Amino acid sequence: MISTAILIPARWGSTRYEGKPLVDLDGKPMIKRVFDECTKSGLDTFVLTDDMRIFELFGSGQCWIDETPYNNGTERCAGAIDNGFFHKYNRFINVQGDMPDVTVDVIYMILKGLNTYDVTTVCAKNPSRDPNCVKVDRDVKTNTAKSFTRTLLLDE
């Protein structure tokens, strides 16, 4: 049986913006906004963090804490999965903790993609020169990602 969980990595010690997960957005911490939208999907949703301040917002039932210095959110998700914490799930959706504009519709698009592919990524056609914005270099013939980067892509 297929069982899917949403994992939201949320690192306190970000090199670009320390404490970003708890930044207040209209009276609610950003990470809580992301979490609340993800739970609208009906899927079990968990926050993965390195810091007690974030852990205390959710508690042990909805949050996994590991102070290992992972390089990125994907590594944090892999660490939690490898640890066995999520043994009852066999599919995972990694939603970035700094994506307060995520919608349940995006989650459903990912679920639909996972019915066909082992890995799926949602991206928007939105050229950006912002080094904080991750860009996807994709193969237009196969509609697959070749790489992800924060640097400017040549065709922009």
What are these regions (language model features)?
Residues P29-V47, E56-G59:
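A short, N-terminal amphipathic alpha-helix
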Residues V102-E156:
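Conserved core of the sugar-phosphate nucleotidyltransferase
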Residues M52-V95, M99-M109:
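Short phosphate-binding loop-to-helix
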Residues I8, L48-D50:
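Conserved sequence signature across two-component system core domains
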Residues M1-E18:
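N-terminal nucleotide-binding beta1-loop-alpha1 segment
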Residues S3, L43-F46, D118:
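Residues at the starts of beta-strands that form the adenosine-phosphate
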